Amino acid sequence: MSEQDLVVDARGTKCPVPVIEVARASRDLPPGSVLVLLADDVAARSDVPAWARMRGHAVAVGDADADGVTTYRVVLGAGQADRST
């Protein structure tokens, strides 16, 4: 993480809160901004990448740490939007 990354801490929340929180945080940020999501909800492992694809963002999903917290690094506007849905 860099000093400029916006960190969204959704630890302890359940689906759909992690995706809602990262979507809310992304609203006012320009393309190229980086959001780092911390979440321990297992559903976020599929929900966050799906949301990112639909919105045209790139996402890197890290491995869960010993406490079950996964780090998601979302780069806004750096992916291809999924127009199939």
Regions found by a protein language model. Give the residues of each.
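Right-handed parallel beta-helix/beta-solenoid
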Residues: 1-9
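A general secondary-structure signal for short beta-strands and their flanking turns/coil
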Residues: 3, 32, 67-69
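Amphipathic, hydrophobic secondary-structure cores in small proteins
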Residues: 10-62
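C-terminal structural segments of small proteins and small subunits
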Residues: 49-85
